[in-house]
């Protein structure tokens, strides 16, 4: 005999349909849209920072007054 396993869902439970009003529903959807856009923009900023940091350091270093060699710009010392 195989025992049935049940999955318990963690997180906030959805409110019942009778207790929600249209104003709270619209506020909830506005919050969700704001949250989605915030997460999307932060992910894009993270990727841009990840791939743009080293080229930025190289550009700033090459525009400095005593022009260093590329090796000096890339070395951590």
UniProtKB/Swiss-Prot annotation:
The keyword Membrane applies. The modification N-acetylmethionine is found at residue 1. It comes from the Eukaryota. Expressed in roots, flowers, young cotyledons and leaves. Residues 1-30 are annotated as: Disordered. The chain crosses the membrane at residues 47-64. Residues 1-46 are cytoplasmic. GO terms for cellular component: mitochondrial outer membrane translocase complex. It is a single-pass membrane protein. Pfam families: Tom7 (PF08038). Residues 65-77 are mitochondrial intermembrane. Keywords: Acetylation, Membrane, Mitochondrion, Mitochondrion outer membrane, Protein transport, Transmembrane, Transmembrane helix, Transport. Belongs to the Tom7 family. Forms part of the preprotein translocase complex of the outer mitochondrial membrane (TOM complex) which consists of at least 6 different proteins (TOM5, TOM6, TOM7, TOM20, TOM22/TOM9 and TOM40). Seems to act as a modulator of the dynamics of the mitochondrial protein transport machinery. Seems to promote the dissociation of subunits of the outer membrane translocase. This is Mitochondrial import receptor subunit TOM7-2. It comes from Arabidopsis thaliana (Mouse-ear cress).
